């Protein structure tokens, strides 16, 4: 199983993906290098997408391992559009096509309200920015060929969220 957790900042991705990883016994991967560069700067992200992510997909396919991602290529699709930064659209399409072919699934954690919520690292990602990012994730669901679950997280009920995801995976 290849399962990616996505969504605007402060939507519970890390907590939910960690809990599901433990519950299912599937390793979880989060690229901790994503915060080494300014998120408005395209160089790190476009290079990671073009070279790192394509190699990672080859690895997963060749060793046939299960993995849960805490952010992956959908973040590049969304945030490159949000910041107006350069990306590699051809590679985004190829990665999405390949992962869809491999049966990958994406859980997008979203809120119905972002009022009073602000990113903990970047103060300019405030409620208004999160609403725009959320709308881009909605656009992503129409673009991707992967199976997608929109998980509403306003109640912050981890037990319900894990149950809903596990039922969706089985369907």
Indicate where each model-derived feature is located:
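Well-ordered, non-membrane alpha-helical segments in soluble/globular domains
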Residues: 47-56, 86-95, 126-136, 162
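Walker A (P-loop) ATP-phosphate-binding motif of ABC ATPase nucleotide-binding domains
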Residues: 2
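Conserved phosphate-donor/acceptor-positioning beta-strand/loop module used by diverse small-molecule
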Residues: 69-72, 89-120
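Surface-exposed cleft-lining segments at the edges of enzyme active sites
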Residues: 32-47, 74-87, 122-124
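Conserved substrate/cofactor phosphate-moiety recognition/catalytic segment
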Residues: 8-11, 15-66
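Hydrophobic anchor at the beta1->P-loop junction of P-loop NTPases
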Residues: 5
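NTP-dependent small-molecule kinase module
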Residues: 124-171
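Conserved P-loop NTPase "ATPase switch" module shared by AAA+ and STAND
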Residues: 65-77
């Amino acid at each position: 199983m290849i399962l990616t957790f996505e969504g605007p900042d402060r939507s519970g991705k890390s907590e939910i993906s960690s809990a599901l990883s433990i519950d299912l016994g599937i390793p979880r991967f989060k690229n901790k290098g994503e915060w080494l560069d300014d998120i408005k700067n395209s160089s790190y992200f476009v290079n990671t997408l073009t070279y790192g992510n394509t190699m990672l997909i080859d690895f997963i396919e060749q060793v046939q391992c299960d993995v849960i991602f805490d952010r992956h290529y959908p973040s590049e699709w969304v945030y490159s559009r949000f910041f107006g930064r350069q990306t590699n659209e051809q590679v985004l399409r190829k990665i999405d096509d390949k992962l869809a072919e491999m049966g990958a699934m994406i859980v997008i954690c979203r809120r119905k309200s972002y009022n009073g919520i602000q990113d903990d690292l970047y103060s300019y990602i405030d409620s208004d920015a999160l609403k725009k990012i959320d709308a881009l994730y909605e656009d992503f669901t129409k673009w991707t060929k992967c199976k997608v679950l929109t998980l509403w997280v306003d109640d912050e009920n981890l037990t319900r969220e894990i149950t809903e995801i596990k039922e969706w995976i089985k369907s």
